[in-house]
Regions:
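Alpha/beta enzyme core
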Residues: 85, 99, 124, 140-310, ...
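A gly/proline- and charged-residue-enriched helix-loop-helix capping module
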Residues: 103-124, 128-142
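Glycine-rich active-site/cofactor-binding loop and its immediate structural neighborhood
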Residues: 74-113
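An N-cap/entry alpha-helix motif that binds or orients negatively charged groups
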Residues: 1-71, 176-237, 373-375, 381-390
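Alpha/beta catalytic cores of nucleotide-metabolism and tRNA/nucleoside-modifying enzymes
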Residues: 1-48, 293-311, 315-390
Length: 390
């Protein structure tokens, strides 16, 4: 029976439900940043410093948010970002989120560090999805990941460039983050208060990193997986690797994790089809600037050479509209869909997308536009961190 989620009117409503339903370690994994979480907070608060210009007595009928991202038609300029541990927010989480995205008309991106495997998602969806790649020291395993993504008919590869080393994530360390949770006294006590989550997890076999276990050398169980992942992220990743990965993949390539114009120029020259201005949701380098602050300089540098998107900090349709007005031709959402997933599964993801769409649509109308293609920075006023008018 379909639930009535009409009372869920904003992403914050979904966050509060997810916090109540999810085990603490997995909620904290979603809703936290690195070190002091300064960048994590700035990612959202800097959006609030941007103001719209309201226009009145204009025709608001026949509005459209439709556009294209790397040539793919999308209902709005949004793709679901790759997020690790998604299947721990809700049982079979990646499958449910992919289904919701497919039905809504936006792309879904599967993380290397997903709980459901590439094959799991492919078997349970019909639209091609995107796959996100971490570059590992085990190049044979990495090349096999690319082959598996090809075999699953993935339509784009998202290369994450900002995780050569792992950021200092204090909550994850204190919680002893693992998938599945270790049977410690603290975890067992917390899990006892999450009966719905536990029952759903008992009804699935997907409880660990299925892209890795059974595929990487000498990784057949959880004990070996822990040491393997801590050793495998490759700190030697370079632009030469990007060229090699592009050749191996042979399809659409998106580079995620760009924050500076110089790196954006290298991404454009690499032959990538799009780049994502992103600080990994504030989970890598703390005390760097917010993604929305970094966006205008990147757009100025390469906006005519490559599709520029952004993620990190998006919690509303207004945020998406502001990013578009500042030059982002697409966005990616992580926490916004994860809150919906943790709260109500597939229906929750759908509700999150409906909320974002409506907020963006109505806000665009109030700025005097009916088609997203016509929207530019003229809809914005200056901010405290940008003294000149946009």
């Amino acid at each position: 029976m379909k639930r009535d989620l009409s009372k869920m009117t904003c992403i914050e409503d979904l966050r509060l439900v997810a916090k109540r339903k999810m085990p603490r370690m997995f909620y904290d994994y979603i809703d936290s940043g690195s070190w002091t979480e300064t960048t994590y907070r700035d990612n959202t608060s800097d959006f609030k410093d941007i103001r719209f210009r309201q226009k009145v007595l204009v025709n608001m009928e026949g509005r459209s948010l439709e556009t294209k991202m790397i040539g793919q038609n999308v209902k709005m300029p949004v793709a679901i970002a790759p997020t690790g541990f998604t299947g721990m927010a809700h049982a079979d989480g990646e499958i449910l989120a992919a289904r919701a995205a497919e039905k809504f008309g936006i792309p879904f991106t599967l993380s290397t560090m997903s709980i459901c495997s590439i094959e799991d998602v492919a078997e349970n969806t019909s639209a091609p999805f995107w796959f996100q790649l971490y570059v590992m020291r085990d190049r044979e395993f990495m090349e096999n990941l690319i082959k598996r993504a090809k075999d699953a008919k993935c339509s784009a590869l998202v290369l994450t460039a900002d995780l050569q080393v792992l950021g200092q994530r204090h909550k994850d360390i204190k919680n002893g983050l693992s998938a599945p949770p270790k049977p410690t006294i603290a975890n067992l006590i917390n899990l006892a208060t999450k009966p719905e989550w536990c029952m759903k997890m008992l009804n699935t076999e997907r409880r660990t990193f299925r892209n890795i276990v059974g595929h990487a050398k000498n990784v057949g169980d959880l004990s070996s997986l822990s040491s393997w992942t801590s050793e495998q992220f490759d700190p030697r990743l370079s632009w030469d690797d990007v060229a090699r990965i592009k050749d191996l993949w042979g399809g659409k390539l998106i580079i995620k994790g760009i924050m500076e114009p110089e790196d954006a120029e290298k991404a454009a020259k690499s032959g990538a089809d799009a780049l994502v201005v992103s600080n990994h949701g504030g989970r890598q380098l703390d005390d760097t600037v917010s993604a929305i602050k970094a966006l205008p300089d990147v757009v100025s540098a390469v906006g005519s050479d490559i599709e520029v998107w952004m993620d990190s900090g998006i919690r509303s349709g207004q945020d998406i509209l502001k990013a578009w007005a500042l030059g982002a031709k697409g966005t990616m959402i992580g926490r916004a869909f994860l809150y919906g997933l943790g709260a109500y599964g597939e229906e929750g993801v759908t509700r999150a997308l409906e909320i974002l769409y409506k907020e963006m649509d109505i806000s665009m109308a109030f700025t005097g536009y009916r088609n997203i293609q016509d929207v530019d920075s003229s809809i914005l006023r200056s901010t405290r961190w940008a003294q000149d008018e946009f």
